[in-house]
């Protein structure tokens, strides 16, 4: 990969070999902790193939139209990196079999005549569901949600009328990331923060 395509990523990611069927000029990385494992790939794309920078609503609407039953939208954001490059990203969660959750990041960063596509897959590893259960029990004890129907626990972050698939739950709010730093969603958001602040 030539220098202009390089994106600074956290140093705890290990470089991996790419496969022949991977996109041209791609680089792959992996990372594993006690609670998550990650596979990440970066490669250049044409700017016209990038998500629309600055237009979060178009991305949200597109994802809502494409989600499968076992998936849910967690986050869509756009902005400018420290080095004044436009970026936009989405995080979608997907149910793993037999248990656990995968958080899929798609992030585009505008370079000049092209964009970099970052695709990462952070999976729950070890004991799954710990974050959800801990926060759910806390909220039940505080009277914020009530069994058995758990009204308000599951909610699309951008459209409360959207009910399809596996909706985001309250434990996935960013405010709980610090309590579960090795959870795959926390790892995903920390990765995004690093990329925005170091590119």
Regions found by a protein language model. Give the residues of each.
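Surface-exposed amphipathic alpha-helical segments
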Residues: 2-16, 122-199
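Secretory pathway targeting signatures of secreted, lumenal, and periplasmic proteins
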Residues: 3-61, 65, 95-101, 105-107
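Context-gated lysine
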Residues: 15, 31, 37, 57, ...
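Signature of long, low-cysteine stretches enriched in small and polar/charged residues
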Residues: 31, 62-116, 120-129, 133
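Generic detector of well-ordered alpha-helical segments enriched in charged/polar residues
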Residues: 56-68, 189-196
